[in-house]
């Protein structure tokens, strides 16, 4: 499968599945619109920051974040069969630390 464009990141408040800014949902609206129009698959990957939690906290939290975005895509008319959802647990890939509290969404040609 070939990824289209760059990932779109949705950032969360520490330890939660609450978005830092609900205006990020406009990005989700647009991703869903494009995915439906062109019959694209969607990859959803949840993450947490490893600096503020252990695996016991971060693994389920990153899954919950991915599940939240997946559910929001389904509310916007995306069939679950078109979504591939994964979680990474705690990561330290981005600076500042808060940038690791995210779910990344990518569109793919089938």
Residue ranges of predicted features:
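Periplasmic OmpA-like peptidoglycan-binding domain that tethers envelope proteins to the cell wall
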Residues: 22, 47-110
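Solvent-exposed loop and beta-edge segments used for protein-protein assembly and interaction
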Residues: 4, 36, 97-99
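Periplasmic peptidoglycan-binding/anchoring modules of Gram-negative envelope and division proteins
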Residues: 12-48, 70-75, 110
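A short, structure-level motif marking secondary-structure boundaries and short turns
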Residues: 3, 16-17, 53-56
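Pro/Ala/Gly-rich low-complexity, hydrophilic intrinsically disordered segments
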Residues: 1-8
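A general structural motif
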Residues: 7, 37-41, 80
């Amino acid at each position: 499968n070939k990824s289209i464009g760059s990932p779109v990141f949705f950032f969360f408040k520490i330890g939660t599945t609450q978005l830092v800014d609900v205006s990020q949902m406009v990005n989700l609206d647009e991703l869903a619109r494009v995915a439906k129009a062109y019959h694209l698959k969607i990859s959803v990957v949840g993450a947490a920051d490893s600096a503020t939690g252990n695996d016991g906290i971060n693994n389920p939290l990153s899954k919950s974040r991915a599940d939240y975005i997946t559910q929001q895509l389904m509310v916007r008319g995306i069939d679950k069969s078109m979504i591939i959802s994964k979680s990474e647990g705690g990561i330290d890939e981005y600076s500042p630390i808060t940038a690791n509290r995210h779910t990344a969404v990518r569109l793919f040609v089938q």
